[in-house]
A protein has these predicted regions:
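Charged, structured surface patches that assemble and position nucleic-acid processing machinery
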Residues: 21, 106-159
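Juxtamembrane cytosolic/matrix-side boundary and N-terminal portion
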Residues: 156-180
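Short, flexible beta-strand-to-coil junctions
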Residues: 46-53, 92-96, 122-126
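Switch/connector loops and helix/strand junctions flanking conserved nucleotide-binding motifs
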Residues: 55-56, 97-102, 130-131
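N-terminal, charge-rich interaction modules
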Residues: 1-52
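Nucleic-acid nuclease catalytic cores
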Residues: 77-106
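Juxtamembrane boundary at the C-terminal end of a transmembrane helix
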Residues: 183-194
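A broadly used, surface-exposed interaction patch
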Residues: 43-76
Length: 194
């Protein structure tokens, strides 16, 4: 399958193309998001063309892609320190097995070293896209951005051209800022009272 449209869209969105062959594309990007508690999302995108997407492919690819992401975007920072790594796997398949569809449409547990695996599939025979459309609590500030990326890759001319603001991230930023201001006010009050 020709993946030129996906390559162009990844490039337009600021991703660096790491590799490309007849079966897929690998791209990376690191970006800071003030609307996501001022955190940095490091994203590795794998776009693959397969004949039939089934659980054996997803299981093998998940392990391989998470390991590749650690090599492509290494970090010396502790796991909890204002950084996240997302692995987005977008499959273009002639057919999608029902178990693979269910896997793509369900929330994924965090991978090793807090890498989030976000699979999606486009069934070329029906034109249907399958990906999880919910938002989990952990890493939730990024899900609107990941869904946007998947929509743009499965239909590069569909939907908005710019990443959406993370409403969940804005709410969390306001909550954290309010708590920080309360802590500062309490510290000043106690310091003045002696």
């Amino acid at each position: 399958m020709d993946l030129d449209a996906q390559r162009a869209e990844l490039t337009r969105l600021g991703y660096a193309i790491v590799s490309q062959d007849d079966e897929g594309i690998v791209a990376t990007r690191s970006a800071w998001y003030p609307d996501a508690i001022a955190s940095r999302l490091r994203c590795v995108v794998f776009v693959r063309s397969v004949r039939v997407l089934d659980m054996s492919i997803l299981t093998q690819d998940r392990a391989h892609m998470l390991a590749a992401a650690r090599e492509l975007l290494p970090s010396v920072l502790p796991r909890w320190l204002q950084k996240s790594r997302a692995v987005v796997a977008v499959y273009f398949a002639d057919a999608v097995d029902p178990d693979a569809r269910a896997f793509c449409e369900s929330p994924q547990a965090l991978g090793p070293l807090e890498s989030l695996f976000y699979p999606a599939a486009l069934d070329r025979s029906s034109g249907a896209s399958y990906y999880w459309q919910g938002t989990s609590l952990w890493g939730g500030v990024y899900f609107s951005k990941l869904r946007f990326l998947v929509r743009r890759l499965t239909g590069p001319t569909a939907g908005p051209a710019r990443e959406p603001v993370s409403v969940y991230g804005v709410v969390m930023t306001v909550v954290v800022a309010a708590l920080l201001l309360q802590a500062i006010a309490a510290f000043v009050y106690l310091a003045v009272r002696g």
